Regions:
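Bacterial N-terminal signal peptides
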Residues: 1-6
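Acidic, polar-rich low-complexity tracts and alpha-helical solenoid repeat scaffolds
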Residues: 7-237
Length: 237
């Protein structure tokens, strides 16, 4: 769960009432244009239950385009306005995460943040290999940058999509380490657990990862589906 924001007008991130379910109709246009947002991807394809869930798609697209172009001040302002105007939109958490990401990683030249934005743009354009190369460059050049966990999560997701379960788990476990204090840690724990199952490892390993998520992040929006999966695994053991 994202921490409370200090900038007033934007509402707190919403959480789904239960496990995510597959979308019952085609994805919004912005997903086909830019790819899923960070938190929308992490939470899975939530059901679209009302027009408010997708209202504001053009505004989100505009903010995302500014971010990918490296216009971070403008992007943060647009994401903030989007979050304030469209609190029901499924990309709300993603917009808030962008604002936090920009605020936490501004520095002279914004080189590390620009590399991340470029990697995101490449992945959204359907160029995962190029995106991975940029993320790896970022990790090599800025190994201690705060944004390194976002590069690593991007690499974990790309590895998962390739079917490279071991690499996906390796990156995810770095993020999930309790010392990282990354907002992506609960999502990394779930990814590592899912990939452990996908590669046919002992279910007890995935169970330990899922239980760690539930113990460390009980209020996470991932908790309900993970809790259900834990029950399923325990029945089979």
């Amino acid at each position: 769960m994202l921490p409370a924001l200090a900038w007033g007008a934007v509402p707190a991130p919403t959480e789904p009432a239960g496990p995510p379910t597959p979308a019952s109709r085609p994805a919004p246009e912005r997903e086909r244009t830019h790819g899923n947002g960070v938190y929308h991807t992490l939470l899975g394809n939530l059901s679209i239950n009302a027009p408010q869930d997708t209202l504001g798609g053009a505004e989100y697209d505009a903010a995302q385009s500014l971010f990918e172009a490296g216009l971070f001040d403008s992007a943060a302002a647009e994401f903030g306005r989007f979050a304030a105007r469209f609190p029901r939109n499924l990309f709300l958490n993603d917009a808030i995460e962008h604002v936090l990401l920009i605020r936490e990683n501004r520095e002279p030249g914004d080189e590390a943040l620009r590399l991340y934005a470029h990697a995101v743009a490449l992945r959204g354009a359907g160029l995962p290999d190029s995106a991975a190369s940029v993320a790896e460059t970022g990790l090599s050049r800025f190994p201690t940058a705060r944004i390194r966990y976002h590069w690593q999560y991007l690499l974990a997701e790309i590895a998962r999509e390739r079917g490279d379960h071991g690499t996906a788990i390796r990156y995810a476990l770095v993020i999930a380490d309790s010392t990282s204090k990354s907002r992506l840690a609960p999502y990394a724990l779930k990814l590592a657990g899912d990939e452990s199952i996908a590669m046919g490892e002992d279910p007890a390993k995935a169970l330990r990862l899922y239980q760690a998520l539930l113990e460390r992040y009980p209020a996470s929006p991932l908790a309900p589906p993970v809790r259900a999966r834990v029950l399923e695994i325990r029945k089979r053991l």
